Amino acid sequence: MGVLVIGVASLAIGWGTIAYFSDTETSTGNTFTAGAIDLEIDGGLPVNFTDLKPGDHGENTISFHVESNDAWLCAEVTITEDKDVSCTEPEIEAEGNCTPEGDGELDDYLMIFAWADDGDNVFEPDETPLMTTPVKLTDYVGRFPIVDSTFNAFGAIGNPLEGGKDYYIGVAWCFGDMTIQNGTITCDGENVGNDAQTDTLKLDVSFEAVQARNNGNFKCVQPI
């Protein structure tokens, strides 16, 4: 019986003398900070043209700057007003059913062409167009990509806009028929009819920047 007690006591002493080397390092001040997508747009918008005459034309350059984070970029064009406004005698003769609140015909004669500009406000053959040929303004109503996973006006498809870098989009417009030959844009107003007299057209153009990191397959699809 005494041996059993001593054995237990010895076992207790043995457990008490076991030691482990250890070291503790503490990492302090760990933080998680959300990044930001801040799109800045300079120049070119809004536009306000009055007293347009057939053959009038111009160019606007819009600059984009995405702060700090790479991003995809989408554009959306929405017509907010399209009216006859008033009905002159030549307009009534050309249109037949002109009413001040009726749909205007100005949009039938306005053409646009847009491209990725290098900042000099001039289209050059080596610059990437956003459309293959000039189009009616109304044909470009809706949502479309400037840079997404399927299209890139500024470089290789799949590469987003770089944060902290400036980009430019040139937009040429024409009240009439627009053509492009060897990089030269021309406007011919010969085919503009009297049905566009006094008409007004208003539209909204919006741009959306969307984070590219962890979002590599993003597309500027039509919103549901």
Model-derived features: where do they sit?
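Surface-exposed, hydrophilic segments of mature proteins
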Residues: 3-4, 10-13, 20-224
